[in-house]
């Protein structure tokens, strides 16, 4: 079992880094933007604006904190079991799992600890829901899964 976990250390390290960046930036945003202030982070592109989201992505299922907290716990547990029980995954699949694990855990920590998710990244040029680093990681997971799917189909055709 120890060897299995050690082989997964890079995957778990990426997930841990996602959680660390997510929680640290949320803590900073909560302290610096609590008064309703909007701060330019990347002028003309991204502003910092604090929002407490009691829903999921795009504020879907608003007010369903307990249900979403249980869902986060179930997904996190399922991913951890998958990581430990399965062989070392191909690169893109491993990155997808790492980003999904880190993003799910990052937002899950907020739900369990605060009763809402801290969102604070607002895209300036378009009207888009405010988001956070965990959301970015979850979207990167989808992208990595698609790249893995594409690369495995390409290699099966040519190999």
Swiss-Prot record:
Keyword Cell inner membrane attached: yes
One Gene Ontology term of the molecular function aspect: aspartic-type endopeptidase activity
Gene Ontology BP term (one): proteolysis
Reaction(s) catalysed by this chain's protein: Release of signal peptides from bacterial membrane prolipoproteins. Hydrolyzes -Xaa-Yaa-Zaa-|-(S,diacylglyceryl)Cys-, in which Xaa is hydrophobic (preferably Leu), and Yaa (Ala or Ser) and Zaa (Gly or Ala) have small, neutral side chains
Gene Ontology CC annotations of this record: plasma membrane
Assigned EC number: 3.4.23.36
The keyword Acyltransferase is annotated on this UniProt entry: no
Role of this protein: This protein specifically catalyzes the removal of signal peptides from prolipoproteins.
Family recorded in the similarity comment: Belongs to the peptidase A8 family.
Name of the protein described by the UniProt record: Lipoprotein signal peptidase
Native species: Parasynechococcus marenigrum (strain WH8102)
């Amino acid at each position: 079992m120890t060897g299995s976990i050690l082989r997964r250390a890079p995957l778990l390290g990426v997930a841990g880094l996602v959680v660390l960046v997510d929680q640290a930036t949320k803590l900073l945003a909560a302290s610096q933007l609590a008064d309703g202030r909007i701060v330019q982070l990347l002028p003309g592109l991204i502003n910092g604006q604090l929002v407490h989201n009691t829903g999921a992505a795009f504020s879907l299922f608003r007010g369903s904190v307990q249900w979403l907290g249980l869902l986060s716990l179930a997904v996190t547990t399922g991913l951890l079991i998958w990581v430990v029980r399965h062989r070392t995954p191909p690169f893109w699949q491993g990155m997808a799992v790492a980003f999904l694990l880190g993003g799910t855990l990052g937002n899950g920590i907020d739900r369990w600890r605060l009763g809402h998710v801290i969102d604070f990244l607002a895209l300036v040029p378009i009207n888009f829901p405010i988001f956070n680093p965990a959301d970015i990681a979850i979207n990167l997971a989808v992208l990595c899964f698609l790249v893995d799917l594409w690369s495995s189909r390409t290699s099966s055709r040519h190999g």
